[in-house]
Amino acid sequence: MPYIEPLAKLIAEFTKFEGVGEKTAARYAYSILKRSDSEVDDLINALRDVKQKVKFCKICGNYTDDVDDVCEICRTRDKSVICVVKEPKDIQAFEKVKSFKGVYHVLHGVISPIEHVGPDDIDIKGLLKRLDGVKEVIVATNPDVEGEATALYIARLIKPLGIKVTRIARGLPEGSVIEYADEMTLSTALRTRVEL
């Protein structure tokens, strides 16, 4: 039996979220039906707030809600070491480890010829503009084909400038996703990084 129209619309909206299939979307929709009006209003307000208040940091590309558009990490941390990641959620994974004291740079993607994503389609230019005074760039893209290609491309651009370029190391199997790695694995990968 098909879903009634309002439920079908809500399920269709939930399936637009990354990693949410129809069954999970239906569970979310049915869960909302069980909630009180005030709980649903709270959810609506939280969704509105996140869209209106959260922006990209103008320095690193991470999410921020600061009025000056600069995240707390960029304001307060050691700027001589930059850890380059694919997307903002990778920063959260590294921050759980609590061992990295430098700053980050979010590429907002990786080089992927199959998906027609080249170096100009991700924020490599923003990274290059931040290199004054930097001693090391740690490339922490996922250990898959696209992540490796991106790491090598970045290394070729930065190494001639006399800046040390390293890659997160063992502990992350090839093809894995940083966001899902546990804290110990990420800590080891950071600590045992290798020079490119």
Q: What residues fall within each predicted segment?
A:
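Extended, structured, electrostatic nucleic-acid-contact surfaces
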Residues: 1-18
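Short Cys/His-rich Zn2+-coordinating modules
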Residues: 7-12, 35-58
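Long C-terminal interaction/binding lobes of large macromolecular proteins
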Residues: 101, 128-196
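Conserved phosphate/pyrophosphate-binding and hydrolysis machinery centered on Walker-type P-loop NTPases
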Residues: 18, 37, 50, 62, ...
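Extended interfacial segments that mediate partner engagement and assembly in macromolecular machines
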Residues: 25, 75-141
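Cys/His-rich short segments
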Residues: 46-91
